[in-house]
Amino acid sequence: MVHWTPEEKQYITSLWAKVNVEEVGGEALARLLIVYPWTQRFFSSFGNLSSASAILHNAKVLAHGKKVLTSFGDAVKNLDNIKKTFAQLSELHCEKLHVDPENFKLLGNILIIVLATRFPKEFTPASQAAWTKLVNAVAHALALGYH
């Protein structure tokens, strides 16, 4: 179980309240597919992923990014029970999709970059530390199905 200070919870929830899940989720997933092209193999049904421009404008990428970030919002709502919150998604990604758990860390790091660029005033070092703790907790919870 992750232990959160009241300040960490505040940094996370106050910034999350400003996040446009569709835009941030789409950008984060698109960046993952561009920066780490080997992750594209999990999205072969998404059509044209041949260039950065194609990925950034791919409706399926953007829609799935929204879906991913909507699920991430469940972590924000359940900070004290992240493992249970992601138990089913962990099983799906492990047993059916066979996603390398390192990819969860990569996406978390990209999410931090996207948040920092979209909210430069709010994304202080203390906020970054809280968000880093959160994305690491989510990545760990998603990887539990591999143990």
Swiss-Prot record:
Expression across tissues: Red blood cells.
The function of this protein is: Involved in oxygen transport from the lung to the various peripheral tissues.
User: Per its UniProt record, what InterPro entries does this chain match?
Assistant: Globin, Globin-like_sf, Globin/Proto, Hemoglobin_b, Hemoglobin_oxygen_transport
Q: Which UniProt keyword terms apply here?
A: Heme, Iron, Metal-binding, Oxygen transport, Transport
Protein name per UniProt = Hemoglobin subunit beta
What is the annotated quaternary arrangement, including any partners? Heterotetramer of two alpha-D chains and two beta chains.
Coiled coil location: none
The residues covered by the Globin domain are 3-147
Q: Which residues bind heme b?
A: H64, H93
Q: Which family does it belong to?
A: Belongs to the globin family.
Q: Which GO terms describe its molecular function?
A: haptoglobin binding; heme binding; metal ion binding; organic acid binding; oxygen binding; oxygen carrier activity; peroxidase activity
Q: Which PANTHER family match?
A: HEMOGLOBIN FAMILY MEMBER, HEMOGLOBIN SUBUNIT EPSILON
Q: Name one GO biological process term.
A: hydrogen peroxide catabolic process
Any one of the GO CC terms: blood microparticle
